[in-house]
């Protein structure tokens, strides 16, 4: 029997339980919310060697109720194509397209596995929270890879295994109870969550999940008929299995260790491969419930996107504040936390303007009389450590200079 994604149980799910919550006020929503893969705010993580290009071709693969419209609204010169298996989700997209005059938005009821039928290729493909619901995630990613231009980027979000341990425990409970995707089952889910002990493994997830207020959000999280979670190794295996290469984590901080240089833990970690270090840290930073990462074709020149702090050429990198990041007095602010700075680290970050290279910044800081004790060699090593750390903590993106 031929598998038809449009008559699959996942398609039935999203026809009945429209998800995520429909947005009716796009500019109002965007005042305090954003899409991490939006090139308007994240292009530097996709293409570190070039500035934002307004008129790119974007595919939102599994656009849900709002995502393609958000991209089209935020990037008015881009051509945005949204595909989804849910007619209900696309109906709301049609409303947003008409209401906001999104002439740059094209919509299709189409499964990811059949994206080839568009006969199009794209600069940026975004599949956020979708591949982990497919019957065959590898086939889905292979299909997307076939529609990616040679220097294009695919942005992917997948469920992270260890941050969803509590979710998976409750999913198993609700399966044992014989719950379905109906209103009585949703009420039982609410009763169980309300009665959970404070130390239940799902508690940390409940604290960060923003969509559990709605019935559709509860169904999507706890009563989904098909989803799976991925480890770091699973993510990289999926990428290589699709004939692609792993470009980078879009959100890197969950995979970084917090201990200072010289600790025994860091010494032991340094003996591991990069992938092994990420794997260790996902089990330590176990609250992380989603992997956000980028991937690209194998033949894309690595010098156009690989950020390298290991060689002395790191001084040519140009640091830029990432979206919603800034320095206020001595506090480095991110959208979700604050890092106090002082001494040389503060002096270095104060010189970041999105135009100066690390080499330029070192030169300016070396002229600071208050840091007279820092010689050029020490300052270079400190700069490497400071900017590598703040890049890994998602405060900075790095531009690759073409000069």
Language model features by range: what are they?
Residues 257-291, 295, 337-403:
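Long, charge-rich, low-complexity alpha-helical segments
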Residues 99-114:
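Conserved SAM-binding strand-loop segment of SAM-dependent methyltransferases
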Residues 86-88:
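Conserved SAM/SAH-binding beta-strand->alpha-helix loop
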Residues 16-56, 70:
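Conserved alpha-helix/loop element of class I SAM-dependent methyltransferases that forms part
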Residues 138-151:
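A short glycine-rich, Lys/Arg-flanked "PGG" loop and its adjoining helix->strand segment in the class I
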Residues 113-125:
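A short acidic, Gly/Pro-enriched loop at the edge of an enzyme's catalytic core
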Residues 153-205:
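Conserved class I S-adenosyl-L-methionine
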Residues 64-77:
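Conserved SAM-binding loop of SAM-dependent methyltransferases across substrates and taxa
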């Amino acid at each position: 029997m031929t598998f038809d994604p449009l008559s699959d149980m996942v398609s039935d799910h999203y026809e009945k339980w429209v998800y995520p919550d429909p947005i009716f006020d796009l500019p109002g929503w965007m005042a305090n919310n954003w899409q991490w893969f939006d090139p308007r705010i994240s292009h530097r993580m996709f293409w570190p060697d070039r500035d934002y290009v307004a008129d790119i071709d974007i595919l939102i693969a599994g656009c849900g109720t709002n995502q393609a419209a958000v991209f089209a609204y935020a990037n008015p010169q881009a051509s945005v194509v949204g595909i989804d298996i849910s007619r209900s989700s696309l109906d709301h997209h049609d409303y947003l397209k008409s209401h906001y005059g999104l002439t740059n938005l094209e919509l299709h009821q189409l499964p990811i596995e059949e994206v080839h039928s568009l006969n199009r290729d794209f600069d940026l493909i975004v599949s956020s929270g979708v591949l982990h619901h497919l019957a065959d995630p590898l086939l889905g990613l292979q299909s997307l890879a076939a529609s990616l231009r040679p220097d294009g980027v695919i942005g992917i979000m997948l469920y992270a295994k260890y941050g969803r341990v509590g979710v998976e425990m409750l999913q198993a409970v609700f399966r044992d109870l014989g719950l379905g995707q109906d209103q009585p089952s949703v009420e039982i889910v609410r009763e169980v969550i309300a009665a959970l002990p404070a130390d239940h493994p799902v508690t940390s997830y409940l604290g960060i999940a923003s969509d559990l207020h709605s019935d559709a959000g509860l169904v999507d999280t706890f009563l989904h008929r098909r989803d799976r979670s991925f480890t770091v190794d699973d993510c990289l295996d999926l990428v290589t299995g699709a004939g692609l290469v792993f470009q980078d984590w879009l959100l890197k901080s969950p995979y970084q260790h917090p201990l200072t240089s010289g600790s025994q833990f860091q010494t032991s970690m340094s003996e591991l491969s990069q992938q092994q270090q990420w794997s260790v840290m996902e089990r330590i930073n176990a609250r992380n419930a989603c992997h956000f990462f980028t991937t690209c074709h194998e033949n894309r020149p690595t010098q156009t996107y690989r950020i390298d702090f290991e060689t002395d050429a790191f001084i040519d990198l140009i640091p830029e504040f990432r979206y919603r990041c800034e320095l206020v007095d001595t506090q480095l602010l991110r959208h979700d936390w604050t890092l106090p700075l002082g001494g040389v680290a503060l002096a270095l970050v104060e010189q970041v303007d999105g135009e100066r290279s690390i080499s330029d910044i070192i030169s300016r800081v070396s002229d600071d009389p208050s840091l007279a004790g820092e010689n050029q060699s020490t300052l270079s090593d400190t700069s490497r450590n400071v900017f590598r750390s703040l890049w890994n903590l998602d405060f900075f993106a790095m531009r690759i200079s073409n000069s």
